[in-house]
């Protein structure tokens, strides 16, 4: 399963050990522009706008601002069923 992780902060760092090994992280997205074009765990971090056009199964929200992130993704045209 190909996933996108939205959020690269403390919640991701605490939860990454629980990601199942069959999950392939395609890319990280984050609203912090200082993190864009850097890497976390060997995976590139990009702007949320860059997720459009990528092939993935789900976007997993890993932030205390999950509700706001979900609204942001809806505004980008991401369907609700793709967001966890």
Placement of each model-derived feature along the sequence:
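A short linear-motif detector with a strong N-terminal bias
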Residues: 4-8, 24-25, 38-40, 64
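Functionally constrained cores in energy, signaling, and assembly domains
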Residues: 15-16, 23, 58, 63
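Short, solvent-exposed amphipathic alpha-helical segments in soluble enzyme
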Residues: 18-24, 75-78
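Short internal beta-strands
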Residues: 26-31
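Phosphate-bearing ligand-interacting subdomains
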Residues: 33-84
């Amino acid at each position: 399963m190909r996933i996108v992780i939205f959020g690269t902060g403390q919640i991701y760092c605490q939860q990454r050990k629980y990601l199942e090994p069959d999950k392939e992280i395609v890319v990280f997205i984050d609203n912090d522009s200082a993190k864009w074009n850097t890497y976390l765990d060997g995976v590139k971090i990009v702007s949320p706008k860059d997720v459009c056009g990528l092939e993935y199964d789900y976007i997993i929200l890993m932030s205390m601002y999950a509700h706001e992130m979900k609204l942001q993704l809806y505004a980008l045209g991401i369907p609700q069923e793709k967001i966890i």
